[in-house]
Amino acid sequence: RRQRQMCIRDRSRSENQSNRYSWMMSIMRRLNEKGTTLALNILNSDSWGDNESFSLSKTTYFRLEDKLGNDSVLFRNQYLKSPQKNNSWRVGITFAQPIGKKMHFRVAYNWDTNYERDNRDTYELSSLTKSEVFGELPPDYEAGYVDSLSNRSHSRTNGHNLDVGLNYSDDTWMFNASLGMTPQKRAIERKMGKLYADTTMHTIDFQPMIWVNWKKKEARITFNYSGRTRQPSLSDLMPLTDNSNPLYITRGNPDLKQMFSHSVRVSFQHSKKGISANIGGQMEQNSVTQVVLYDAKTGGRETSPINISGNWNVYGSANWWKRLGHFSLRLDMNGNHSNRVSMINEDKSLEPKKSTTRDTGLGCDAVSYTHLRGPRD
């Protein structure tokens, strides 16, 4: 017979208040008759808020014993206050220069800064109020402040984005290519209970893009590729453990790597023959996923982020359209296939296993309809 690990009885109530504003300004000036332009852009946003919550819980652990040999019981009557504040600025200039009649050169620079503050203050009310009282703060609630269950998090990111692009256009070809590079300095200070950690990172992200279009009479072929690197969140990189909830413990991973996503698409269209088709796909390298470990005694979970590769998908579609007098026929076909990789721990072991989920979809739709003419005058 399967033995129960725990029994939880809880009540909770929360209130959240948030505020946000943003503004932007853009100024562009034409420098000469050839079309050389210079633009200035400024963007600012600010948000702040406060979350207050009450939590009353009683957890009985059937596989843990107290000093008297009985089932261990954890009783909590908590008040949590979580103020947050975010502020960001972006200031950039863009310079565009025609090169002849068919080509344009573009360079843009942006300076970005972002500040985030996320705190949590925890107060234990068990010894300050009656057990049946819920959702009310006693006058001396600050005496129940629990440092080990509270945290402080302050982070700032400063980045410089440089983007260089080239455009070309004539009667047959259209071409657009760009490369973006973003060096960043990211710093975070975090305190969880009595644990403290801070770190400063210097990273570089890249954003390549190419778009090519060929057109001749009624036929058109388009190719598009875009890529992007992305850094793990600073909170995931911190080597700290948050055990404020004993049944849901989270850990950081300072060894997380940079993620890289790719997207490609090719399309064909012939308007006179009424046919079109496209095929494409996406792929991710070093995606971040959560690994879950289970505690057999308490039934609790412990999660931490890791990198994993193997997430990709492909898709395609084709369309045919034909008009026959007052009738029209249309045939649509499409298909897709995805491959998703994750870490699972169904047997609640200490070694999670890699799991791959594959999905395939096919569709076909045929439509016929009649064109009706209105009465003549």
List the model feature ranges, each with a label.
Residues 3-11, 370-377:
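Conserved small/polar residues in nucleotide/adenosyl-binding loops
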